[in-house]
A protein has these predicted regions:
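Structured catalytic-domain cores with a bias toward divalent-metal coordination
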Residues: 1-121
Length: 121
């Protein structure tokens, strides 16, 4: 597959990742140059969060009371997929959940589906 095959701004790349309790969370991005905006819900575990590259997606997840981080456009290129997507204007969402939070991660994926289907905007 050629890399150019994914350079379509109407298609999203969704990454799914797990973390360990307290090691990596939405709080990790407070006062961090990689984050343009951070929203942490008072009712959600900060270990379960989204990383997005587009402001409308940040607003969508915030409006749905989900922990969400908007990656900064000036974030250093560390070779990550999110940086690649942002530089190439490919919408990107990382669904990050604590290991063992399978139910929460499934709910997060359903919220992604809602975003992608245009429902709830």
């Amino acid at each position: 597959m050629e890399v150019t095959a994914i350079k379509n701004s109407s298609k999203y790349i969704i990454a799914i990742h797990n973390n360990t309790n307290g090691e990596f969370s939405a709080k990790s991005f407070n006062n961090y140059s990689h984050a343009a905006k951070v929203y942490i819900s008072k009712s959600k575990d900060p270990d379960d969060f989204f990383i997005v590259t587009q402001l409308p997606d940040f607003i969508f997840f915030k409006r749905h009371n989900q922990n969400v981080v908007l990656q900064s456009k000036s974030a250093a290129d560390d070779g990550s997929l999110s940086i690649y997507c942002q530089k190439n204007r490919i919408p990107y969402i990382n669904v990050e959940a604590q290991y063992g939070h399978k139910k929460q991660q499934i709910l997060m994926l359903l919220i992604c589906q809602k975003l992608l289907s245009g429902a709830g905007k």
